């Protein structure tokens, strides 16, 4: 059992590591923006549209949620100004007044809520529909999935009324997993602590009270279902993972899984299908590893990515690079992996830093990372949020992913 002293020394270590990280940011990043949110967000996702306001910055939008103590919770559409290539960005610039660093021209990386929508309980997860990004689904501490069209709400709520477009019924407990079908508009899957996956078509006829019953309820897991994801290319295929350590592959046309794999040695918390390859997917687990799978032969794990020091809760493929994958979780780190480097020769010194496929470690958070999102418009730009209210937008230095020999002398970069 952890004592108070343990917690304090852990905080001290995290703080020391953060100081080293901050000192090294000019060498490691082309962009770093840190913002303290009013409340922690358990979820983050970039919206796909951007606005170019001037030659030196563009306006991007993020879907966030709140996790308040006892106050009203909100689903948030927030805007953030991002530098263009013409802007001069200084990753080392620190604003003591704001407690933020990173700046360029008149833009300081501030995240400003554009629209606040009342939400019942904290927002466990929020994801937009790919075919119509103004439609957002959320998971909360209730068993229901809520659907909103954010264009139908004022920028600030007039009162505390909770008024989603739809309430999707089918679960008996809360959960986190949520996935819109990338090929068929309106189809959505949800995973729950009740050991099931529910499937809805939001184009269906809802009742007068705005409630819509699940079209199918899939039962195959023997414990909590942690995550669910549609296959990116096959519109009727999806995967689910859970605390029973299993990966299940399903087809909508049948109510039993086509494949059931013992995927990890502990709970499986997340999965993601590769957007470029119809056979490749990744799973992340409490066993501290990310596993790589080939749907053509699920009996054999293709590869195990090992470098995290604690449970993994998120895994996501880059939307721009077929071989790039990122993972994050309880160890406060976000790891970026490059599949093309698996098996490359390493010096003993390099091996101490991790396997050859470990491209980058983002060490800017001092608490568990709750969620992250790859920017769909800006390659290599990531937004990550942690339990201590911190939101960071960052991009690793291009000499890291361009395989250019690092010009920073090794003795100038401190090790954490």
Curated annotation (Swiss-Prot):
Keywords: Centromere, Chromatin regulator, Chromosome, Developmental protein, Nucleus, Repeat, Repressor, Transcription, Transcription regulation, WD repeat. InterPro entries: G-protein_beta_WD-40_rep (IPR020472), Histone-bd_RBBP4-like_N (IPR022052), WD40/YVTN_repeat-like_dom_sf (IPR015943), WD40_repeat_CS (IPR019775), WD40_repeat_dom_sf (IPR036322), WD40_rpt (IPR001680), WD_repeat_RBAP46/RBAP48/MSI1 (IPR050459). It is found in: Nucleus; Chromosome, Centromere. One of its GO terms (biological process) is mitochondrial unfolded protein response. One of its GO terms (molecular function) is histone binding. It holds the Pfam family CAF1C_H4-bd. Its main location: nucleus. Gene3D superfamilies: YVTN repeat-like/Quinoprotein amine dehydrogenase (2.130.10.10). The keyword Lyase does not apply. One of its GO terms (cellular component) is ESC/E(Z) complex. WD repeats lie at residues 118-158, 170-210, 220-260, 263-303, 307-347, 364-404. Coiled coil: none annotated. Belongs to the WD repeat RBAP46/RBAP48/MSI1 family. Binds directly to helix 1 of the histone fold of histone H4, a region that is not accessible when H4 is in chromatin. Probable component of a NuRD-like complex, composed of at least lin-53 and hda-1. Interacts with lin-35. Interacts with hda-1; the interaction is direct. Component of the DRM complex, at least composed of lin-9, lin-35, lin-37, lin-52, lin-53, lin-54- dpl-1 and efl-1. Interacts with hcp-3. Core histone-binding subunit that may target chromatin assembly factors, chromatin remodeling factors and histone deacetylases to their histone substrates in a manner that is regulated by nucleosomal DNA. Required for hcp-3 and his-1 stabilization, localization of hcp-3 to centromeres and for proper chromosome segregation. Synthetic multivulva class B (synMuvB) protein. SynMuvB proteins are required to repress the induction of vulval development by Ras signaling and probably act by forming the multiprotein DRM complex that represses transcription. This is Probable histone-binding protein lin-53. It comes from Caenorhabditis briggsae. The lineage of its organism: Eukaryota, Metazoa, Ecdysozoa, Nematoda, Chromadorea.
């Amino acid at each position: 059992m952890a004592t108070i002293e343990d917690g304090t020394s852990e905080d001290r270590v995290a703080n020391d590591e953060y100081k080293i990280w901050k000192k090294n940011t000019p060498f490691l990043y082309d962009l770093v923006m840190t913002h303290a949110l009013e409340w922690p967000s358990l979820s983050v996702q970039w919206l796909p549209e951007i606005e170019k306001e001037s030659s030196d910055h563009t306006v991007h939008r993020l879907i966030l949620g709140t996790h308040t103590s006892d106050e009203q919770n909100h689903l948030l559409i927030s805007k953030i100004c991002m530098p263009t290539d013409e802007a001069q960005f200084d990753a080392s610039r620190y604003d003591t007044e704001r407690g933020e660093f990173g700046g360029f021209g008149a833009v300081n990386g501030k995240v400003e809520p554009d629209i606040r929508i009342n939400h019942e309980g904290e927002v466990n997860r929020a994801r937009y529909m790919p075919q119509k990004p103004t439609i957002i689904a959320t998971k909360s501490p209730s068993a229901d999935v809520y659907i909103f069209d954010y264009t139908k709400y004022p920028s600030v709520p007039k009162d505390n009324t909770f008024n989603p477009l739809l309430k999707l019924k089918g679960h008996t407990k809360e959960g986190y997993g949520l996935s819109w079908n990338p090929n068929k508009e309106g189809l959505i899957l949800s995973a729950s602590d009740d050991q099931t996956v529910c499937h809805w078509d939001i184009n269906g006829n809802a009742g007068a009270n705005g409630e819509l019953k699940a079209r199918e309820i899939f039962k195959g897991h023997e414990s909590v279902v942690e995550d669910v994801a549609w296959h990116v290319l096959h519109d009727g295929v999806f995967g689910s993972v859970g605390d029973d350590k299993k990966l299940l592959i399903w087809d909508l046309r049948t109510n039993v899984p086509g494949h059931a794999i013992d995927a990890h040695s502990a709970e499986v918390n997340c999965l993601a299908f590769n957007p470029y390859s119809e056979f490749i997917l990744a799973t992340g687990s409490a066993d501290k590893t990310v596993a790589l799978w080939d749907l053509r032969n699920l009996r054999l794990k293709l590869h195990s990515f090992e470098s995290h020091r604690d449970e993994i809760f998120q895994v996501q493929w880059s939307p721009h690079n077929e071989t790039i994958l990122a993972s994050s979780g309880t160890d406060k780190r976000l790891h970026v992996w490059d599949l093309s480097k698996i098996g490359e020769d390493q010096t003993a010194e390099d091996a101490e830093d991790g396997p050859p496929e470990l491209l980058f470690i983002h060490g800017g958070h001092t608490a568990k990372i709750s969620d992250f999102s790859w920017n769909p418009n800006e390659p290599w730009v990531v937004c990550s949020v942690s339990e201590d209210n911190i939101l960071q937008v960052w991009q690793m230095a291009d000499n890291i992913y361009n395989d250019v020999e690092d010009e920073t002398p090794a003795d100038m970069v401190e090790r954490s």
